[in-house]
Amino acid sequence: MHVKTPASQHRRLLLTSRKLLQRKVYDIENDLPGSLRNFGLKVGVVGAVKFEDRIRELVADHPVVAAIVGPLLEARAVLRIQFGKLHRMLLELVRTDPICRRLMSAPGVGPIVALTFRTCVDNPARFSRSKCVGAHYGLTPRLYQSSEIARTGRISRCGDLMLRSSLYEAALVVLTGPGRWNSLKAWGIAVARRRGMQKAIVAVARKLAIILHRMWRDNTDFRWTAPSV
């Protein structure tokens, strides 16, 4: 069993702490509109910056509701400030890390995905072959086999959920985002036409894991005009 380095454990703590604060902010933002709807108050479409002003405007004539909602808004404000601190810390860490900067040369890979991959893999020498990375993190189909039949099922979902989710989000950006055309996107679009978008996203996530590991191992940036793998 691989024992993560202290630096990797610090990076993971930063990622999970940032995610925790972000999730709590989202919980408040998602819960309040539904709660206020019970009083006939409709929040409507509003961005994060104007969210608090909109809520306070709605409850201004409802003193009891305002007294209850006020602490939630104050808690949200504090959470957003602390989330911002961790997010800036993360961006600075990525900016000064040459491995993360190299990983970000790949399509769909931003600071969060790069740092997550760097943290979870920790040491590329752990994997003798780049193709092992996708299987290790649960992005390969399960094989069901008996004496009479052999079929593949859904992905195994073993390994680190944080990395698997990050790769999935990166793959979604590759396939649906407006970014520069590249061989990985072309391959993923072809898979989507044959097998559907959901399977294409998983396939691109798996291939992206292979590409990122190879880039890290070989100290090379993503080659936009060359074959991906």
Describe the predicted segments one by one.
Residues M1-V229:
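A detector of single, family-specific signature residues
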